[in-house]
Design a protein with these regions (language model features):
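Beta-strand-turn-beta hairpins that frame and shape the catalytic cleft
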Residues: 1-6, 108-118
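Mobile, glycine- and charge-enriched loop segments
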Residues: 1-22
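Active-site beta-loop-alpha junctions enriched in small/polar residues
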Residues: 10-12, 78-80, 119-123
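Bulky hydrophobic/aromatic packing residues
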Residues: 11, 88-90, 117
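Core catalytic region of metal-dependent phosphoesterases/phosphodiesterases
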Residues: 15-110
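Binuclear metal-dependent hydrolase catalytic cores centered on His/Asp/Glu-rich metal-binding motifs
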Residues: 27, 112-126
Length: 126
C-alpha cells in the first residue's frame, strides 16, 4: 500500500514581504495534500523569517489545523533559529483530528504507518 507524504520547508513567511503570495502558496500546499489524500504532512524549518507576528501565527495555526484534520503533521524547527521555539510550541498545541508533533531535536518520530527521523540542523557559525 503506497504511502503519500507532502513536504515543504524554508517558507520564511513574513508579514511585511510577499505575505499574500506566500499565504496563497501555503493554501495550495495544504489543499493539494488534502486532495491527494496524503498520509503525512511534513514542514521543516524556517516557517517565518524572524519572531512571528500575530498575523503570521494565525495563518500558520489555521494551516496546521487544516492539515491535522486530514493527516498527521510533523513540524521540524529550522536551522537558522530565527523562529522561536515558543512560536512552534503554539503550532504544536493546535488540535486537529490527527496528531501534530513538534521536533526541536533529532529524534525518531513514529506515526501509524511510518517512522521519520527528524533532525534540526543548526547553521555553523565562523
Amino acid at each position: 500500500m503506497p504511502f503519500r507524504l507532502s513536504h515543504t520547508g524554508d517558507i520564511h513567511l513574513e508579514e511585511d514581504r510577499y505575505f499574500g503570495d506566500t499565504a496563497q502558496c501555503l493554501e495550495w500546499f495544504v489543499c493539494d495534500g488534502i486532495r491527494q489524500n496524503v498520509d503525512l504532512f511534513v514542514i521543516d524549518g524556517d516557517l517565518t523569517t524572524y519572531k512571528a507576528t500575530i498575523k503570521e501565527r494565525n495563518l500558520w495555526i489555521d494551516m496546521v489545523i487544516q492539515m491535522a484534520d486530514h493527516a498527521p503533521v510533523l513540524l521540524v524547527s529550522g536551522n537558522h533559529g530565527r523562529e522561536s521555539d515558543g512560536d512552534l510550541y503554539a503550532l504544536a498545541k493546535a488540535r486537529g483530528q490527527h496528531r501534530i508533533h513538534l521536533s526541536t531535536e533529532p529524534e525518531l518520530v513514529e506515526f501509524d504507518r511510518v517512522a521519520v527521523l527528524s533532525s534540526r540542523i543548526r547553521a555553523r557559525r565562523k
